[in-house]
């Protein structure tokens, strides 16, 4: 069989498969992170989805194409609305949620609004306590879903956003 393959290759001018090992060097990741969230470094880069990582190890992700209105209330948190097969409300609670990280990105206005944040992590109490002063700290992430013709149930925490207009 090898002779037949060689004969076909020689008549059709097909090159032999290379046995040379190609080493690919990773130039560098296009993503950076702080303890609370990960983000794309390029100012024009856009993430396709955003993942919410819970302290218990579970996670849930949504495509940025589903992202609708956002509300930022420094005393209540950051509320994101994703609209797909259902409506998903995601509340990110913590402190310094709009603080600059590395002088280039923040969670809200220079991050999620520009689709640069790829993941957000709920921190354990130990991680939150060990954070440097002024750092972004994510205390809790809450997600509730409901149908478009229904109201969300068990989401009393939405009341603080009704007041912020």
Task: Please place each PLM-identified region on the residue numbering.
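Anionic N-terminal interaction surfaces
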Residues: 3-45
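Short acidic, Gly/Pro-enriched loop/turn segments at secondary-structure junctions
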Residues: 73-84
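Phosphoinositide-dependent membrane-docking surfaces
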Residues: 63-75
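Short, conserved, surface-exposed binding loops centered on an aromatic residue
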Residues: 41-43, 59-60, 70-71
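Helix-rich interaction surfaces within compact, conserved domain-sized segments
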Residues: 3-17, 91-165
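A short macromolecule-binding patch
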Residues: 61-63, 86-96
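Glycine-centered tight beta-turn/hairpin loop motif at sheet-sheet or coil-to-beta transitions
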Residues: 55-57, 83-87
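Short aromatic-glycine motifs in intrinsically disordered, low-complexity regions
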Residues: 47-61
């Amino acid at each position: 069989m090898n002779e037949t393959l060689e004969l076909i290759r020689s008549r059709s001018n097909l090159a032999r498969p290379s046995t040379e090992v190609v080493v690919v060097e990773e130039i560098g990741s296009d993503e950076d992170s702080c303890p609370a969230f990960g983000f794309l470094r390029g100012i024009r880069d856009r993430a396709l989805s955003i993942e919410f990582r819970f302290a218990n190890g579970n996670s849930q992700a949504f495509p940025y194409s589903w992202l609708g209105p956002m509300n930022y209330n420094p005393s209540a948190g950051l509320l994101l609305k994703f609209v797909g097969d259902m409506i998903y409300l995601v509340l990110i609670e913590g402190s310094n949620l709009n603080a600059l990280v590395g002088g280039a990105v923040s969670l809200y206005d220079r991050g999620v609004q520009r689709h640069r944040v790829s993941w957000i992590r709920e921190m354990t109490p130990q991680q939150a306590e060990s954070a440097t002063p002024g750092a972004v700290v994510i205390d809790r992430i809450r997600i509730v879903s409901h149908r478009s013709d229904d109201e969300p149930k068990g989401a009393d925490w939405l009341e603080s956003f009704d007041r912020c207009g």
